[in-house]
Amino acid sequence: MLIPSKLSRPVRLDHTVVRERLLAKLSGANNFRLALITSPAGYGKTTLVSQWAAGKSELGWFSLDEGDNQQERFASYLIAAIQQATNGHCTASEVMAQKRQYASLSSLFAQLFIELAEWHQPLYLVIDDYHLITNPVIHESMRFFLRHQPENLTLVVMSRNLPQLGIANLRVRDQLLEIGSQQLAFNHQEAKQFFDRRLTSPIEAAESSRMCDDVSGWATALQLIALSARQNSHSAHQSARRLSGINASHLSDYLVDEVLNNVDLATRHFLLKSAILRSMNDALITRVTGEENGQMRLEEIERQGLFLQRMDDSGEWFSYHPLFGNFLRQRCQWELAAELPEIHLAAAESWMAQGFPSEAIHHALAAGDASMLRDILLNHAWGLFNHSELALLEESLKALPWESLLENPRLVLLQAWLMQSQHRYSEVNTLLARAEQEIKGEMTGTLHAEFNALRAQVAINAGNPEEAERLARLALDELPIAWFYSRIVATSVHGEVLHCKGDLSRSLALMQQTEQMARHHDVWHYALWSLIQQSEIYFAQGFLQAAWETQDKAFQLIKEQHLEQLPMHEFLVRIRAQLLWAWSRLDEAEASARSGIEVLSSFQPQQQLQCLALLVQCSLARGDLDNARTLLNRLENLLGNGQYHSDWISNADKVRVIYWQMTGDKKAAANWLSQTPKPEFANNHFLQGQWRNIARAQILLGEFEPAEIVLEELNENARQLRLMSDLNRNLLLLNQLYWQAGRKNDAQRVLMEALQLANRTGFISHFVIEGEAMAQQLRQLIQLNTLPELEQHRAQRILREINQHHRHKFAHFDENFVERLLNHPEVPELIRTSPLTQREWQVLGLIYSGYSNEQIAGELEVAATTIKTHIRNLYQKLGVAHRQDAVQHAQQLLKMMGYGV
């Protein structure tokens, strides 16, 4: 819940001096990316900008405090300020900020700018007290903000020092409007106006000018002069002389003498107690100070000129001027040290009563009251956890004694979930085991079950499916239906374990159940996870269309719940890329893989390994080995600089082994094979993939017998577990083994089975990457004219893809090939005396490649009637009457030229 006063522009008071000369300068702010107002405390930065902002509706205001160094808190308020300025235009960014569904501040800002691209009016965002920001991540994100903000947006920043926002670069590019302390200092005319409004008896212009000069136009000093003159009998000029040359760091003594010592004791205590509040309203003041009418007291303090300012138009929220507030807090620690814990405790209770647990925690920590802190956490910690207030929760839990956690085991569970969210898996089990040992009395079955659900999640994350299944089952046996979050976790883990075991049907049912529960209780990240798992299961079963439709549901969920910046989004676009690749939609597959890399742009480069492997895979399917090698260099560099799950390594190894196959690099394959551990099982599609990598390397090295043993066992497991996509892949690799071993009949048998299975999977690229060996076999099958219609159509499609992406010169009879052919001593006389045109040679090459007339016309981009004319002419020149004769003639020419066909 956001504090309204932090988003309210200060109210312009009647007695303030209108700074016309500075307002004139600020009137051109819309021509700059950044308007920067810098000066020490008390020069009127906030007052000036609030005067300038008056009447501007498309303006958001964000007043910072020290707590805004938390990235999530900073983001929430900044987006809320933009929403204030645009009347709620940026809904997606708002949801992402509220639910912490973004990878980084920069990526959140990128989404914001996408939405602001449709906002065409001038827009202003004011950030006050930026000097309070010390988090370098926020500085870097704001530099990103300034580089990429829309042209119609101006950022206005007030700070006591020069912020780390790339100021020099903006200045050089004339994109910076600056106002500093010299310009903010009051001139003689403004000082005269100021005193005329503050003092009951007017003073001469000359005296006003002298006082202004004595304090160098410092607004705070002028205000103190006026305050002293009203409270004391000595003249304003005496105060001016005392303040001459003083600065903010030496004000304390003056403020004690001239302010605190000149108010009654009740007012003094009111000021000191209320100063612990960063912002205050009637209820807070009443509870903290004990005075009955807090609002009236605040208005009285404001009338006395004691540096209090209204923070909203309704007059409900107030705050002290930062300079005076800091002074009062220091004095409070000295003068009311014994009472201070009680004051903070009262503040915490009041913030809780108004529904602001984060502010209440701040005061409970300051009070050192573990009981209060414990009670707040017991009631609100899980809500804060679900809103990703992780840093605040961690600080709070550290402040509680271990005994307090043991007395309230759900706080132990919360601490364990915090560790899990930070991937500190080993610490989770250590913490839970210690808690179970030391908790006094018997733990309830429900609490045990919650512990086990979390342990199950840790176990599956650590690659221990057996333990994960045991713990998930224990949790589900004991968890009441109402304990929905832990039930969602345990059900998801159980489904994932069954997926790993190859029990796809039961896994699918559990993942569908997880999705239903997660949607019902708005646990969106588990809903998304379950959809991704369902898609993977459908893919493994060979139901790629069902996988596609499930992915569409997941994309819709991401859009509706603004989950675009969760790392899981990368998982989804990656499996979409895998599916597109399988169907030979290579451009779309590549774009999807690149979007996955973009999702992970704020994470460590190692996280991009799988998407990078997919980019290599796209290059391999296109036959672009140069680009594949460039990408492989990046991939192998990542492999050498990180620790990865076995599934990730398997996917990376797959493209490496295929590349070695295509380039004939037996040395690399042999070296890899000697170092690669063999998986213990092959009962899921992850393990099948690594065994396939091993078999492919063995085939490349001519180790046909061990490769055949591997592939036959893989097929047996795949048939038993209904891993139909893996069976399809295994058959294609077995086909290559038989072909290279000279077992042509076996090769043809498994190829026909693979083509039949591809009617279900839709596979194209898996055939294409096998290159010319696959093309030769498909040509023969097409010539035999024995394939069923669907398989025949797929075989022709695969041939087109091979010819498009793996353009062997002999398949297309290009000019160089034809020239060498005509100069060959054994070329048939008929070819010499009646030479084919270049176009006719191209047509012959495409006929040999298995193209139909329509496909040849499409390839050469000419009319079908033109192709018929070319075919008739080349038949006549070759002395053949039928298509099969032309294919055989082309085959003889290729053999004569030394190509093994």
Swiss-Prot record:
SUPFAM superfamilies: C-terminal effector domain of the bipartite response regulators, P-loop containing nucleoside triphosphate hydrolases, TPR-like. GO terms for biological process: positive regulation of carbohydrate metabolic process; positive regulation of DNA-templated transcription. It comes from the Bacteria. One of its GO terms (molecular function) is ATP binding. InterPro entries: P-loop_NTPase, Sig_transdc_resp-reg_C-effctor, TPR-like_helical_dom_sf, TPR_MalT, Tscrpt_reg_HTH_MalT, Tscrpt_reg_LuxR_C, WH-like_DNA-bd_sf. Residues 853-872 bind DNA. ATP binds at residues 39-46. Pfam families: GerE (PF00196), TPR_MalT (PF17874). Keywords: Activator, ATP-binding, Carbohydrate metabolism, DNA-binding, Nucleotide-binding, Transcription, Transcription regulation. Residues 829-894 form the HTH luxR-type domain. Activated by ATP and maltotriose, which are both required for DNA binding. Belongs to the MalT family. Positively regulates the transcription of the maltose regulon whose gene products are responsible for uptake and catabolism of malto-oligosaccharides. Specifically binds to the promoter region of its target genes, recognizing a short DNA motif called the MalT box. NCBIfam families: PRK04841.1. Monomer in solution. Oligomerizes to an active state in the presence of the positive effectors ATP and maltotriose. This is HTH-type transcriptional regulator MalT. It comes from Escherichia fergusonii (strain ATCC 35469 / DSM 13698 / CCUG 18766 / IAM 14443 / JCM 21226 / LMG 7866 / NBRC 102419 / NCTC 12128 / CDC 0568-73). The gene is malT.
